[in-house]
Regions:
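Short Lys/Arg-rich basic patches
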Residues: 2-40, 58-84
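Short, basic amphipathic alpha-helical segments that act as recognition/interaction helices
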Residues: 50-73, 103-124
Length: 126
């Protein structure tokens, strides 16, 4: 996954994006799912080779941003990305806790399943 993702401009492969789009969730929910998947894949890349445990520390995230070729020349975007990591990290940690796994063990399939279930519950309440 990492090798395929590195040929892309971001951590998500085309197949991952297609898998998200295939959910047919409403546009806003798919966008949110893509953001969470992007952050999860980034955390997993930063933590590599670790595949379980907590997400990387803020310091490790900052180091990764400073060394990433697409972020090196745009420090302001790096600051925004770190804020996004923080917000997404909280949501992903909550999901991992609900599933009884560590945050780094989360998979795209689990994110998709959670998003689809949340959309179903939202639809039933309306």
């Amino acid at each position: 996954m990492v090798e395929e993702a590195q040929s892309q401009p971001g951590p998500l492969t085309r197949a991952m994006v297609e898998q998200i789009d295939a959910t047919l969730l409403p546009t806003l929910e798919r966008h949110h799912l893509r953001l969470l998947a992007h952050c999860l894949a980034s955390f997993q890349e930063i933590a590599s080779p670790s595949t379980q445990g907590a997400f990387p520390s803020r310091e490790a995230q900052e180091e990764w941003c400073q060394g990433h070729p697409l972020l090196r020349d745009d420090p302001q975007f790096g600051v925004l990305l770190l804020r996004q990591f923080e917000a997404a990290g909280r949501q992903l940690e909550t999901l991992a806790q609900t599933l009884g796994i560590t945050p780094l063990e989360l998979t795209l399939e689990q994110l998709i399943n959670a998003a689809v279930e949340a959309a179903k519950k939202k639809h039933l309440k309306q």
